[in-house]
């Protein structure tokens, strides 16, 4: 009954939000970051995948193996006609366990390996960026040339301190090798430090391959710390971000996979509403 209600909600949202004759922004259901359902995955991977499958989710970005193995998760995905397109790992594992990371990514069936945090003492500075660039170029080359995997760095807000005529994020874009390093744009962690996600995508249309879909509670002021209370994640379309403008820019770029990420403790209430919002968007 719960799953039936969710499906009815999604259909109702789609019918009410779409304008007849307009093309939906998403032909296929956007994916999901496992971090959204981290508490549930930690208790029961199979049951959590069942929940996501019932909502129409097929595309997964796993940021953790949750006490299982890559092979076990792959089997559970295959049994549900789901797939993992991106595998998120920690910075240290990327650098020191590159081959193990690659093996797990290949077993999962992922095309991308992603890192979402650069260890640093705040504030993030040029020396941090320089080290990350060197590590990303080196690991990215191994992943691409030896395993046909694409490395992506996921921005987290602290990279936008001024540098030269731009920011440290611009520096990282300029100094990383496009053949080996791509990027995943987290739109909340682009907006939070004062940047325009749509403008950033237009500036680097070929470097972004993945996107985290998030929204920030109205009234919350940002900074460059890379952190905000999890309660500030809200249902897509109800916060501060201009989702239609961002997605318009994204659709004209090289972004291939979109993942819903909701860090809120009430994600299970918010995610169905976010899905309905996305399905109701039209071009």
What is each residue range found by the language model?
Residues 3, 21-34, 40-55, 166-169, ...:
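Histidine-acidic metal/acid-base catalytic patches
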Residues 61, 86-88, 114, 152, ...:
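Conserved beta-strand positions in the central sheet of alpha/beta enzyme cores
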Residues 50, 58-59, 91-182, 268:
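Active-site acidic/histidine proton-transfer and metal-coordination neighborhood
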Residues 82, 110-111, 147-149, 252-256:
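A short helix->loop->beta-strand "cap" motif at the edges of active sites that frequently abuts
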Residues 37-43, 59-71, 89-97, 120-124, ...:
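Acidic-and-aromatic substrate-binding clefts and catalytic sites of carbohydrate-active enzymes
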Residues 2-11:
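Sec-dependent signal peptide recognition
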